[in-house]
Amino acid sequence: MYLNSRITRIFRLKKERFWQQNFLYPLLLQEYLYSLAHYHSFNSLIFYEPVEIIGYDNKSSLVLVKRLITQMYQQKSFISSVNDSNQNGFSLHKNSFSYHFYSQMVSEGFGVILEISFSSRLVSSLEEKRIPKSQNLRSIHSIFPFLEDKLSHLNYVSDLLIPYPIHLGILVQILQCWIKDVSSSHLLRLIFHEYHNLNRDIPSKKSIYVLSKERRRFFWFLHNFYVYGCEYIFLYRRKQSSYLRSISSGVFLERTHFYGKIGYLRVVSCYSFQRILWFLKDIFIHYVRYQGKAILASKGTFFLMNKWKFHFVNFWQSYFHFWFQPYRIHIKQLPNYSFSFLGYFSSVLKNPLVVRNQMLENSFLINTLTNKLDTIAPVIFLIGSLSKAQFCTVLGHPISKPIWTNLSDSDILDRFCRICRNLSRYHSGSSKKHILYRIKYILRFTCARTLARKHKSTVRMFMLRLGSVFLEESFLEDEQSLSLIFLHNIPFLLHRLHRERIGYLDIIRMNDLMDHS
């Protein structure tokens, strides 16, 4: 409650306070920001590893934060204080856990400050322009009805990976358009320097390895900021170099330094950029992105999609100063191509429909073809993810999870059921349900092998003693609830439940196992 009240007071500051100061650098020394960053960062650690493996709890973490704040108040450099900070009873060696913990806490606190500043500027800009705020926490499954409605009428699709900048200094230059405070810029470069050293020389200790695998809040913010800069091409094209008069594009106004980019592009690309714009007019073009993967679809010709591809390449090379290979952007014809997006293999299938028509004494058949979007869960990627997480072999054979044998039976069963439930819910939009049944089979027998190993027994003896119902009731909880819903509303569709694609409206992120693939 104390942290929430303090953060609420920050958000209630007047707008003039945010604009008068160059940046919120004095807030960097406040403890509650680091505590908030600790709460968001370490409580969302990888779901199948115990928190005790890192070697700290909430009390000790607050002690580390306070020691860090004390050193910063004493105006000691973060790097120079590594060798002479043993006065508090612990070492800050460069390969120690405390050193990397300090580095992460600095970056997380700095990321919280960035979010507060940029979100306040964005909200104030939307209120001044009377633009309604959009809901950011929209379910991922809501994208598939959009794709099903749009892609079935389009001809070509291009899937691309938004390139990541080669050097972190590019991200510093992007943020310096907004951050005018010199101290904050130096601290930003220091964080990048520490991150580079951490990736170059990661110790073999398991605690630091788990800490380094955590996706930091600060770098997620930088990645999103960079992606919005890459999407600047769409804003520039919608109004043909007009200065953002459309409401739909106004939401990106405060995320990118728009006017500076326009002037810079005119100098770099001269007048070739203006000559291409009239050729790229296409009202049937659609763009969908999740994280670094984007889909660009159009009803135009292959020549138009090829122009868009080279336009992307030229834009990234001229603005972000790095070379991007054009062959990494694939252009395929939709009826003959399947693309990977959001953990699914999606393709447009031709669905034949035969209708018999009779006029007077003559009857004839009308054969029509309709396009339908088909989504399939990638079984090879899922098994590969389970194999990397040590739930099965590469071929999909269940194995025991020895790291969980020190837990109680209820905790082991709860973890397996939670993983199975998350995978089943996320991939419920797959048209082939036997893939989900295979994943459930692997997790079910992995759970049985783990419990049998804990009790020093075989799987057969364990199942005979407790019965197969012991695992079936837990792993079939979602299917039973769905059966009750469909039975109550439309009972005649119950026999088709195993073929129906079901979407959930509360999924705002991909499951953790899909990140391994």
UniProtKB/Swiss-Prot annotation:
GO BP, one annotated term: RNA splicing
Alphabetized UniProt keyword annotations: Chloroplast, mRNA processing, Plastid, RNA-binding, tRNA processing
Molecular functions (GO terms): RNA binding
Any single GO CC term annotated in Swiss-Prot or TrEMBL for this entry: chloroplast
Primary location recorded for the protein, binned into one broad class: plastid
One Pfam family, short name: MatK_N
Keyword flag RNA-binding: yes
InterPro entries: Domain_X, Maturase_MatK, Maturase_MatK_N
Subcellular location(s) per record: Plastid, Chloroplast
Domain of life the protein comes from: Eukaryota
Family label: Belongs to the intron maturase 2 family. MatK subfamily.
Role of this protein: Usually encoded in the trnK tRNA gene intron. Probably assists in splicing its own and other chloroplast group II introns.
HAMAP family: MatK
Protein name: Maturase K
Native organism taxonomy: Eukaryota, Viridiplantae, Streptophyta, Embryophyta, Tracheophyta
Protein encoded by which gene: matK
